[in-house]
Amino acid sequence: VVVGYSQQRKISSIGSQSSLKVSDIKMPSASLTSALVGRLSGVIAVQRTGEPGKDASDIWIRGYSTPNNSNPLMIVDGVERPFNDIDPGDIESITVLKDASATAVYGVRGANGVVIVKTKPGIIGKPVVNVDYYESFTQFTKQPKFADGITYMNTANEALTTDGLSPMYLPSYIKNTESGMDPLLYPNVDWQDVLLKDGAMTYRANLNMSGGGSTARYFVSLSYIDEEGMYKTDDAMRKDYNTNPSSQRWNYRLNTDIDVTKTTLVKVGVSGSLKKRNAPGQGGNVWISLMGQNPVSIPVMYSNGYIPAYGEGDDRKNPWVLATQTGYQEIWNNKVQTNISLEQKLDFITKGLSFEGRFGFDTDNHSQINRVRMPETWRAQRERDDYGGLLFQNRSIEKPMEQTSSSTGERREFLEAILQYNRAFKAHHIG
């Protein structure tokens, strides 16, 4: 097993650890951290959001350990780096080091435990091609149940009169709403039903090939994952842009092992991912509005296509408008991870002695384009004209589409050298 900066026989390891093979987590989940839930003892994964492309979980090993940050140290192929964007089909094994004896070699960085990921190497033999394809249907784990409009108005009136205040809704208003005869002036809207779909599809595909001979071996893979969003969208807008939260990710990997001599092994690994996320122009404000909008203030849209302004006594914006009419955000993330290692046996000095040097170079570039607009809004009066038409009052003018953009980037370098001694003397083993 992989322990600290080296590999060790499992029987010789006294530290607490758990191991997992990739065959145990074959599933269409886009988040590798979430896929670990329930598969490794002592590992807790807390998902902060289910938004496509942002659904990575916080991992705790044996609970919350340190006050500021309880995420464990993550090691991929010997280099400290995150692993959530790695395709599960590229992973050979995952090892979790839990207690102090297992993580001591990492010092304070291993205080919250260590997660060690080893990707697949090349194998000796004829080329072997594997193709995996998965589909899944994602649903909300739990949705809050809100009161309908009639219950809401009666409860609001009861709360006000209990405090000695005047009721907010007149009996005639409640009666007109209950009749459903004029839903534009007396709406009763289930905003969750208007905005949210029953579920969304996730698709994941992986193509990999491995092979090689006694001198050189290789593993190469390509993968793609597509997460659809859970919002209902305005079909009229889709011809121009998509406001539904969604995520697409492309991954590639090349691992090669080359025996330069009988005692010298060179390993080269190059991998990367390109992720595109889509979101409404107002982003997180959609959920704030959805959870706070009462059902009787405004309709979704007027019959003439006018967008309703704020409801009476309610300063929150129409959640459907925020999700479908305010433009969109496009976020791109490009990662490249490389590592080169040299393993040299030094048996000519003493049997069992070896040297290993490793260099890693990672780049992470992030760019975001925001194209945001606000539509013109109207307020319908509480009476109709002589011909039965609605009377409108303009409440805000249209703000045309504006574009802003930003980009950031970082690079990380990793260098280490290890001298190991591993030898057996009859029934005794040193290493």
PLM regions: where:
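Short, intrinsically disordered, charge-balanced linker/junction segments flanking boundaries
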Residues: V1, A417, Y421-G431
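Short, small/polar-rich motifs associated with maturation and membrane association
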Residues: V1-Y252, V266
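Extended hydrophobic secondary-structure segments that form protein cores and membrane-embedded regions
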Residues: I75, D132, S354-T363, G431
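Flexible, solvent-exposed coil segments and beta strand-coil junctions
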Residues: V96, S179-D190, E228-R238, E312-T324, ...
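Short loop/turn motifs that connect adjacent beta-strands in outer-membrane beta-barrel proteins
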Residues: G122-P127, S214-T215, M230, T263, ...
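Flexible loop and strand-edge segments within Gram-negative outer membrane beta-barrel domains
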Residues: F140-K142, V189-S223, E227-Y231, T243-K317, ...
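Flexible, surface-exposed loop regions and adjacent strand-edge segments
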Residues: F146-Y152, A236-N242, G283-Q293, R371-Q381, ...
